[in-house]
Amino acid sequence: MTMFASLTSKMLSVSTSDHASVVSLNLFVALLCACIVIGHLLEENRWMNESITALLIGLGTGVVILLISRGKNSHLLVFSEDLFFIYLLPPIIFNAGFQVKKKQFFRNFVTIMAFGAIGTVVSCTIISLGAIQFFKKLDIGTFDLGDFLAIGAIFAATDSVCTLQVLNQDETPLLYSLVFGEGVVNDATSVVLFNAIQSFDLTHLNHEAAFQFLGNFFYLFLLSTGLGVATGLISAYVIKKLYFGRHSTDREVALMMLMAYLSYMLAELFALSGILTVFFCGIVMSHYTWHNVTESSRITTKHAFATLSFLAETFIFLYVGMDALDIEKWRFVSDSPGTSVAVSSILMGLVMLGRAAFVFPLSFLSNLAKKHQSEKISIKQQVVIWWAGLMRGAVSMALAYNKFTRSGHTELRGNAIMITSTITVCLFSTMVFGMLTKPLIRYLMPHQKATTSTTSMLSDDSTPKSIHIPLLDGEQLDSFELPGSHQDVPRPNSLRGFLMRPTRTVHYYWRQFDDAFMRPVFGGRGFVPFVPGSPTERSSHDLSKP
């Protein structure tokens, strides 16, 4: 009888727990719907955008739950870095690579890598040195060198979503490409830096250890990129050879989604950078795999990946907003609010300083290497790039939770101060800087119609957005050139030609290699699956008529 009563009580507790989870999920889905509807209604608002809308709805919901629970709880779900890195981040980064306008991205690849990789290291260094200088005077806890370096990596991670939602990539292709590309590379670099700092022995620092650290850093970068490219090529080869669309387009779509996610999980399995891997997997898939599937599969995958990315971004901002009022973490700093405000202010100042320390110098160096005025970064564009990287978001939150909590909970005062300061910086930068983004960009970058050649180069109504343009310039390079450039791409037959036109030289040899070796094996642009009853068959039949 006692055993039966014990079993019954356990079943009731499980049932109650399941019911609470169902209620939480239902409310969260309803909040997501509200974010989409309200964000759409406020789309033309001067100050608001979808990210800020989701954040405010999350904060408001947290306040309501806090009042209902009488100060005991403020969120439906506890922020988990595992949930963020495993389920929410992959679709966002993959879609970024899948939809990227590759011509602009690779045209500015060196500048993007300089901003995203070198700039992140510079920003991390300045934030770490500033934290060492100021935090020891505030007596917030005992932090070692590894902790300070981790703080630098945490706050070097930017979140440029608010700026990208305002910029128009057809009107300002150069600026959009730089902000977008830097954001992806910055996230990857920050995570790689953070993981390297966590796993590296910092007790014995010398020149050999420093070179080993740099070697590991570049090793992760190159291997992660290679894994993403390899996974994308495998998916292209399999779909090209097996003609899944002959039997079912569902299999094509399913395989593309699973291969994309597999690339990220393989990177995590081998302790590489999943962000870089899935990003380059997306680029390769859009260049080869996407062209190997049927027309219906192309439309489906384009919208499916974009929808998953949009939902994940909205979920993250809603999630962060609700978790910002977590009572457990704020209780530790309730006795010294001045210290918490001081830490947050110092971090925000260091973020702004670290950002300026590389954006303007690297832009100056980039302009020295550019020949045409249209390719140079103007001072107004530099200000927008600097501003776009001031906001901090879910990556910083996830890294902070990983470093300063255990299973989402913290027991040390210093760790609690760092968590609450991270939340404060993320909320302040996203809401204040995010609300000022639209007016700032409208002031600095008045709406100007792109030139005819640029617009035609970057968009095509007959094909899905951003996927029309082939990798590293395709066959259309000759007919779509920026004003002031040569109409065709001559064969670079000398070292002087490479030094004078390095970008075009790389494009030329890439096109030769792609056409001769890659496309015959992996398909891509020009490969059209012949599926009975499909639009492909009908168009082919129409073309065959006299």
Curated annotation (Swiss-Prot):
Cytoplasmic side: 1-21, 69-75, 97-111, 240-264, 326-344, 403-415
Induction: Induced by abscisic acid (ABA), and by NaCl and sorbitol in a ABA-dependent manner.
Keyword set, alphabetical order: Antiport, Glycoprotein, Ion transport, Membrane, Potassium, Potassium transport, Sodium, Sodium transport, Transmembrane, Transmembrane helix, Transport, Vacuole
Tissues and organs where the protein is expressed, per its UniProt entry: Expressed in roots and shoots.
Pfam families with a match to the protein in the record: Na_H_Exchanger (PF00999)
Originating species: Arabidopsis thaliana
GO molecular function, one term: potassium:proton antiporter activity
Glycosylation site residues: 292
Name listed for the protein in its UniProt record: Sodium/hydrogen exchanger 2
UniProt-annotated location(s): Vacuole membrane
